[in-house]
A protein has these predicted regions:
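Short coil/loop residues immediately preceding or within conserved phosphate-binding loops
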Residues: 25, 274-275
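Radical SAM enzyme [4Fe-4S]-AdoMet core and its adjacent flexible, acidic
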Residues: 122, 132-134, 139-270, 282-287, ...
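Conserved alpha-helical substructure of the radical SAM core
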Residues: 1-128, 227-230
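Short histidine/acidic/glycine/proline-rich micro-motifs that form metal-
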Residues: 84, 112, 174-177, 294
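Short, ordered coil/turn segments that flank beta-strands lining enzyme active or ligand-binding pockets
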Residues: 32, 281-282
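Flexible mid-to-C-terminal extensions adjoining Fe-S/redox cofactors in radical SAM and related proteins
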Residues: 1-16, 20-22, 261-272, 283-323
Length: 323
């Protein structure tokens, strides 16, 4: 088991796109609705909460946005939510975007994927489905996700996808509610021959409820560091982990892969956000990154090209604090 690394061609294309301001990769957040209710989620809403803000964007709107983004250079597209498979028109959206030649990945909790879903996924297969594994038992799913059948549902989905030849990558969001399952999650991944990418850091729920920052279901900094080291040990083996500690090769030990954030005060951001990647929220705001609480332009109103221009400008103006 190892943390997946992007192919060199993907890194090269993103580096070139960043220099030229081309939106090579993006995310469409199709819905804030989800059939689960995870304690640490930053975006989930009930249907009533969502409708009070605005109706969901239609399949036709998302497909038109895909066409506009492709004209500007989009190639790698992630479809996420909420839970995208909860949308009755998700098949239509996926098929339309697939026909445009985009390389599509899907984020899902996996619990809604059954035989009928797998059959139509095989017709327009995504490059990969990223399934978050929240525990190694139904009990943990009940405690963290409020779905007491979740583990049974997702493991069945993972096996169905594997039998259909659809690539699956496992993600693991570690919290105080499922930390005891960490070894079990890695054991399951090994048994299924799957990659697993785990993190002990949860973004604060700025978009869902800013008042909960610092109060939500996350580790303390000390706990997050401990579990980051534990994850490193499980990924590379305890012997290699101990050798690394002895050699004092700490660089990157607790950092997420691909994360390259500078620490000098006043320095600009180094990641791809607003340089060659973007995120469109379910309401239609185009942001440099989905974790930013900024408003962003309404991409369905001003069009993709203008919304992307504004996102690039916003990202270029971000400066890092000293701490």
């Amino acid at each position: 088991i190892a943390i997946p690394v992007e192919p060199p061609i993907t890194e090269y294309l993103h580096a070139k796109a960043a220099r030229q301001g081309i939106p090579l990769s993006g995310t469409f957040e199709l819905t804030p609705l989800c059939n689960m209710n995870c304690r640490m989620c930053y975006v989930r809403m009930s249907r009533e909460q969502q409708e009070a803000i605005r109706p969901l964007r239609t399949a036709a709107q998302w497909l038109e946005l895909g066409r506009q983004a492709k004209e500007q250079g989009l190639l790698y597209l992630l479809l996420t939510g909420g839970e995208p498979f909860l949308r009755p028109d998700f098949r239509e959206i996926l098929a339309g975007l697939h026909q445009m030649g985009l390389l599509i990945s899907i984020n899902s909790n996996g619990t809604l994927i059954d035989e009928s879903v797998v059959r139509w996924l095989k017709e327009t297969p995504p490059v990969r489905i990223n399934i978050t594994l929240y525990g190694a038992s139904d009990e943990t799913y009940g405690r963290l996700c409020r779905n007491p059948q979740g583990f049974t549902q997702v493991t069945r989905a993972i096996r169905l996808l594997g039998e259909a030849g659809i690539t699956v990558k496992l993600n693991c969001s570690l919290t105080p509610h499922n930390a005891a399952d960490l070894e079990g999650i890695f054991a399951f991944a090994k048994e299924e021959g799957l990659l697993v990418q785990a993190t002990s850091y949860m973004f604060p729920p700025l978009r869902r409820d800013p008042s909960q920052v610092g109060c939500n279901d996350r580790f303390t900094p000390q706990e997050a560091a401990y579990y980051a080291a534990r994850i490193e040990s499980l990924l590379n083996g305890e012997e290699a982990f101990l050798e690394r500690l002895k050699s004092q090769s700490w660089e990157g030990l607790c950092a997420d892969p691909g994360e390259d954030c500078g620490t000098l005060e006043g320095e600009g951001i180094r990641c791809r956000a607003g340089k060659c990647s973007f995120w469109v929220t379910w309401e239609g705001r185009l942001l440099p990154c989905g974790m930013l609480p900024d408003q962003g332009a309404d991409v369905f109103q001003v069009g993709f090209a203008e919304a992307w221009r504004q996102a690039r400008e916003a990202a270029a103006g971000i400066r890092l604090p000293a701490k």
